[in-house]
Amino acid sequence: MEATAEESVSTLVTTMVDETYEFLAPRWFDFVNGETEDESRRAELWFQSALSCAPSPSVPRIKARRSFKVEAMCNFNEAEEETLKDKEPLEPVVPIVSLQSQPSQAKKAEVAPSKASTVKPSRISSKDAEVNNKTVDASDPTTEPIEDKENIAPACTPKPPMQFSLGAKSVDLKKQQTARKIASLLKNPSTLRPKNQSQAKGSHQKSVKGETNLNNIASTTNLIQENQAIKRQKLDDGKSRQILNPKPATLLHKTRNGLVNTGFNLCPSVTKHTPKENRKVYVREQIAPFVSTAELMKKFQTSTRDLFVQNRPKLTLTRPKEPEFVTSQRARPLRVKSSAELEEEMLAKIPKFKARPVNKKILAAPALPAPQRSTPHLPEFQEFHLQTMARANQHAETSSIASTEVSKQHNDQKHHLTEPKSPVLQTMLRARPTIAKTTAELEQEELEKAPKFKAKPLNKKIFESKGEMGIFCNTKKHITIPQEFHFATDERISRPESVLDIFDKLSLNSESCHEKPLPRNTAPNPFNLKTEERGAEKEKKFYMELMYKKLGDVKARVPKANPYPYTTDYPVVPPKPEPKQCTQPEPFQLESLVRHEEEMRREREERRRMETEEAQKRLFKAQPVIKEDPIPVPEKVRMPLTEIQEFNLHVEHRAVERADFDHKIKEKENQYKRYREESEAAKMVEEERALKQMRKTMVPHARPVPNFNKPFLPQKSNKGTTKAKSPNLRVIKRTERRTMMARPTISAATSASAVHCLMYPGSSFNKLKKKTVLTNIVHCLMYPDSSLLN
């Protein structure tokens, strides 16, 4: 891809949130109250005035074991582009020259920019573009085109830094400066930033100070990459692929303002190199001056835009990349502990209980003597000796005869029931009467309030009814008559006729089999449904009930005279009732008649009103002569001038509303904070209470001393000894059966051996089986009927 060799000094402005600080910051600082201008100015001045501490003596040991995390494992485009570079013709490429060791040349470049030579466009690979971004812009007039063959990296080691110096002194000076910076860069590796690998088209002059600063970073990055081991990537086919230029991990929240890169360079950070900075390594760089957004936009609009050559870029495979969200930097870690962790902490805080060893003297102590038991005695009952009896006996002698007579008279009187009498209380003498009612009065009021029940007269029709009304009568149930099931299948499927029926149908005259009966119209046969029968029965029953009811009403209308009382002396003749007056007929008061009368009256009034109006209209009345214009011309009114009123802008009262809203939000946050603190305090109190309760329950209690008064004495068992009994196994019967079957063969073998011994007394068989054969012969002679003889 053809492009002009130019490096864009870009700064990447990203912020990284310190999770530990963000989590602990609310404990030391109130974020609700805003920061004042004095506090912000004091904080900014601290970064300029404060200095870092001296280097630690353990820096060499830290540098020896310092390692970097690789941000991007490898550049997948490098291997493909190297194969394409071999096929393409080589063209002169812009050399990469370090200007860090030549401050005088940088000044010349600023004074005489007209001497800058144009750069011939060439094909630059992504690998070369990455190296060019880490080095100085190639638009210096002292550079000369060289061949691209020197830029090719070997295939077995990481890509070395590609730098060309103008002299041996410049190389030494550059190494010295990088050595001074290596301690700080190894201490804080987050300053190593991956540069944007964008290929700029066109020539654009940049500041030499910013270029020297980038050269320092690029040279340090390459120096660190030289010391890294070779990294390989494992492929699918079992092969490995070399990873070139592994990039160290960047910690965004630890970067300094002077080393931050961005893709849009409106205000590049300018750092000033002082002799003091060259002497000390850990000196902070000065902060870039503040530039407003309006100045940045004005500078961007007035600057000359970059001219791009209309070339079609090379198509490459899209590599997936994880998006960088602002929420990932803003999110705080979850520090809420789980229930398992809380339980572990509680168990760890519980004081561990360790039981003391048992004192062996307690077990070795002698048994306590048996307590002495006293013999029980029956309780002795004592009589009551009251003082009243003694006093009565003492005063009996001194009592007079009169007192005894009076007592006798009182004893002779008949006793009566004591009538209750209400006590005379002082409260009854008060002026105000008591309002409280007695229980009798309350009961009387309840009885008066209770609804009075009056029984209705008995209906005599209940006795004449058969259970329809009044008392229910249990009707006698009839015996269920079984009925045969009538299925339609019996009619559809005819049963096979018996032989007798077929024989009866036989006749002497043969019937023609080909005769077909004439088709006839199907006669409709209505269904005989049970529901219709039940409906007819129900209607009949209903009619009968109506008839009985009418008969009862007729009987009820007939007056039934009561008989005269049976008296002989004075017969009671009922008086003749007074005759009632005849009923006078009164016409019905229908609402329709009333409405008709009102409607007729309204029509008559309407007709009368219309007649009066027409009569008034027929009357003529002359109008007066017109002296003045009935429609005068309106005079022209002088309108006042328009008063200019100011606009009622929302900006005027929006700030006040916003302040009120912020005040309400602050109050609500304080209220929530107070609620949270109260809930946490209550939770802590509850946890402490539960912990105290758990500690109370876990208090160890000593076991009581064992009682050795009744030691355990094993007694002799009453069961007898176990008698051994051989099991009735089938194996025994099976072996006996086999021996019985094998006996005839044994007898034949023994007889043969006996004959052999008699015929050959000196044989080896005779020596071996001599004893067995002799025993068999003796057995056969003693028991001629045995199986051996057979």
From Swiss-Prot:
Renumbered to this chain, the Basic and acidic residues biased-composition regions fall at 407-417
User: Quick one: a GO biological-process term for this protein?
Assistant: spindle assembly
Annotated Gene Ontology cellular component terms: chloroplast envelope; microtubule; nucleoplasm; nucleus; phragmoplast; spindle
Q: Which intervals of the chain form a coiled coil?
A: 588-619, 656-698
Note the SS bond partners: none
Q: What else is known?
A: TPX2 over-expressing cells display formation of nuclear and perinuclear microtubular arrays which are not specific for the transition to mitosis and occur independently of AUR1 kinase.
Please state what the protein is called: Protein TPX2
Per UniProt, subcellular location reads as:
Nucleus, Nucleoplasm; Cytoplasm, Cytoskeleton, Spindle; Cytoplasm, Cytoskeleton, Phragmoplast
Role this protein plays: Regulates prospindle assembly during late prophase and at the onset of mitosis, before nuclear envelope breakdown (NEB). Is exported from the nucleus shortly before NEB and organized into two polar crescents. After NEB, is progressively associated with the forming spindle. Probably mediates AUR1 activation and localization to spindle microtubules. Has a microtubule binding capability and is able to trigger microtubule assembly induced by RanGTP in a heterologous system. Not involved in phragmoplast assembly, nuclear envelope reformation, and cortical microtubule assembly at the onset of G1.
Subunit and partners: Interacts with AUR1.
Gene name tied to this protein: TPX2
Q: Does the keyword DNA repair apply?
A: no
**What are the protein's GO molecular function terms?**
microtubule binding
Q: Which InterPro entries match?
A: TPX2_C, TPX2_central_dom, TPX2_fam
What keywords tag this UniProt record? Cell cycle, Cell division, Coiled coil, Cytoplasm, Cytoskeleton, Microtubule, Mitosis, Nucleus
- Name the predominant localization: nucleus
- According to the UniProt record, where is the region Disordered? 101-160, 188-211, 394-417, 701-727
Polar residues bias located where? 115-124, 132-142, 188-202, 395-406, 715-725
Describe the disruption phenotype: Lethal when homozygous.
The domain comment in this protein's record states: The N-terminal part of the protein is required for the interaction with AUR1. Two regions (220-463 and 684-758) seem involved in the targeting to the microtubule cytoskeleton.
